[in-house]
Each structure stands twice: as structure tokens, then as C-alpha cells.
Amino acid sequence: MVYLQKQDKEVFDAIKLELGRQRANIELIASENFVSEQVMEAMGSVLTNKYAEGYPGKRYYGGCEFVDIVEDLARDRAKKLFGAEYANVQPHSGAQANMAVYHTVLEPGDTVLGMNLSHGGHLTHGSPVNFSGVLYNFVEYGVREDTKEIDYEIVREAALKHKPKMIVAGASAYPRKIDFAKFREIADEVGAYLMVDMAHIAGLVAAGLHQNPVPYADFTTTTTHKTLRGPRGGMILAKAEWEQKLNKSIFPGIQGGPLMHVIAAKAVAFGEALQPEFTAYCEQIIRNSKKLAETLQANDVAVLTGGSDNHLLLIDLKPLGLTGKAAEKVLDEVGITVNKNTIPFETESPFVTSGIRVGVAAVTTRGFDEVAIEKVGVLISEVLHNLENEEVLADVKARVANLTNEYPLYPSL
């Protein structure tokens, strides 16, 4: 960043501070990851200068012959990665990918069945504060109060009752596997479209460690970061018959020019995900997640559903008499980054919450194995049991520093 350092020291200094934070902290926010240096290089390339409204071979601007190569690479790699007939890599985010699908087959006021946000869903799955809940008539399904897991018979009953035009499967805070085949059966029974938002688990799906929704869903959306370990962005997968309508929904429907530097970075990340090393990485994610859940529970910290099948888990703080807001703050002070999160049947506000969400994708990228993640579980437990004990917190902070020093992040930057 030699040019930035010379020309804009304020921005340069802020970026360096953030790099220092990422290096020094144990990053456990489930939606975050550390991209490779080559993904960052693509993001910072001259492609940021190029406007390319339209699609490869059908642009509204001249001079697109080389960005066409990049977008074709991204689309082809995405289709290969997930076994899809069609891929659109232009959505700027997962939210815009979801918006485009809704825009393709729904009319304002149509009924959609989606997962309750506090039970693990997402804002774009019908939250009243989101465009989805404003434009469409979303009705909810959730998890069982006893197991905190999806009960597919309850989903079926809701579908039969409300007769939705679309069912949305997928979650932002659900630690167990989702059976997309069962969702397909329910959708077929009521004549609904099925959209799967696999944003959190896309990397695990690509690695063959979670059921692939693409064969079952009419539309599959995802972000390209999180477990897929690419740049921040979105993507839509579907059968070839939807190509024309979905393309129009993205452009000119809800977006203008695509971000070609981001699409290049997506292509790089998809190429990485096609390698055997990526499968090994995702296998380590699962091992780490299970070890973290096991360690927390052994140290009297409540883990919802008793464990995890993916990269994340939810901690229930009610037995400890804590709030997510308080726990997030103190954990951050000792160098452990998590986010407060609502839990099923929540009694606190979304700004306070009764839980925290913890994910291991980023630390696994950093090289943490089961031995290291067990240490992380012990550190979290010590903080949660000693939230106001300055001596314990100081000791944890020192041990966090020792642990992160063992696993250098971006040493070449």
C-alpha cells in the first residue's frame, strides 16, 4: 500500500489498525473469514475501472472483451463447484441475490414461508424491518422449543395452512444440517417455489460436507464470503430455464453495472474451492466446530442443540444470567470477537439478546486445529464465568495474545 501511505495517511492508518486487530484477535464471527492474498489482489486490480452493464457477449459498453473472460470464468467455476446449470455472479450481496429471486417470481403481497429471524433465519427471509417483510406477506416457521431444531412436519403444516407461493429454506444462525429434500417435498405438496439461501454453508456444500440444495431448489442463493472464503458478494444458481428472467432481474431490474474487480475475486475464490485443499479445510472446520461445542459444554456453557453440524454454534447465556450484549463487549476487550445473537424463543431485545453466535471458519483458515480450538473454548468459558473479574480477564487477554502469535495472519502485508 505504498501509494496509499503516501497520498492518504488517514485511510492508510485506519487500514493498518484493522490489520492489527485481525492479527491480534481470535475472530469468531460466523459470517467472517480471511481471504487469500490472491483474492485481495484481484479485488484491488484495474478491473475496478471498467463499467460492464449487461452480460458477457451482450454488454451496453465497449471494451468489455477482457472482463467477459473474467465473468465467464467465475460463472463456469461456480457451476462446476455446485453442479448448477446456471450461475449469476453479479449480485453485490446475498441480500441482493435474494431480492432478485423474489423480483423474478413474486408480486407484492404474495405469501412466502420463511424461517423466523430469532430462530435462525435472516433479515431477507421476511423480517418486518427489511424490504422482504414490507413487500411480501411472509409467514414464519421456526424450531421446536425442546430440541431447538427444525421440525419438518411443523413446516409442512404451515405450508398447508398458508399455501405460500414460495418457501425459503436456509439460515444465518442454525447449527444443524438442513434437509433440502424434505423442503422440496413440502414445496411440491403445496405447489410452491423453493428458494434455498445457503450463504453460511456454501463452502461446506462445495466440499461435499452438507447436502447440496441445487438439485432440490428452484433457486439457490449465497454470499461468496463466509465459508466459501471469497470476496464479499452474492450469487444465484438455478436451472438453465431461468437464465433470461434471473439475468433481467439483476440487470436492469435491481442493479446497474457489475463490480468486475469483485467478480474477478469471486473467480479466484471459486478456483480455490475446486482444489482438494479446500475440502481438507472444510473438514477441519467441522472438527473444530464440534470440538469447540464439546469444550464449552464441558466447562458449563450451554450450547443450543447440544452441538453443531456446520461452522457455527449458538451459546445460550440465560443459565449464566448474562446477556449477549455484555458477553460480546467483554470478550472483545480480551481479544475474542463474537456477535450477540437472538436465540429461539428470545425474551430480550435484538440489541441485547440472550445469546452469542460463534463460528470457526476464520480461525480455521488461520490454521487453528482441535488443540488450538480447545484452548479457545476454555478461554471463552473463563470469560463467561468471570465477566467482572479483572484478574481473570487480564490473564485471558495475555493467553489470547500468545495463541494468536502462534498463528500469524497475512505475514507478507
UniProtKB/Swiss-Prot annotation:
GO cellular component, alphabetical, reads: cytosol
InterPro entries referenced in this protein's UniProt entry, alphabetically: PyrdxlP-dep_Trfase (IPR015424), PyrdxlP-dep_Trfase_major (IPR015421), PyrdxlP-dep_Trfase_small (IPR015422), Ser_HO-MeTrfase (IPR001085), Ser_HO-MeTrfase-like (IPR049943), Ser_HO-MeTrfase_PLP_BS (IPR019798), SHMT-like_dom (IPR039429)
Asked whether the keyword Amino-acid biosynthesis is assigned, the reply is yes
Site residues by UniProt (Plays an important role in substrate specificity): H225
Q: What EC number(s) is this enzyme filed under?
A: 2.1.2.1
Where (6S)-5,6,7,8-tetrahydrofolate binds, per the record, is at L117, G121, H122, L123, S349, P350, F351
Q: How is this protein organized at the quaternary level?
A: Homodimer.
HAMAP family, A to Z: SHMT
Write the protein's name.
Serine hydroxymethyltransferase
What is the organism of origin for this protein?
Listeria innocua serovar 6a (strain ATCC BAA-680 / CLIP 11262)
Instruction: Show the taxonomic lineage.
Output: Bacteria, Bacillati, Bacillota, Bacilli, Bacillales
The gene is: glyA
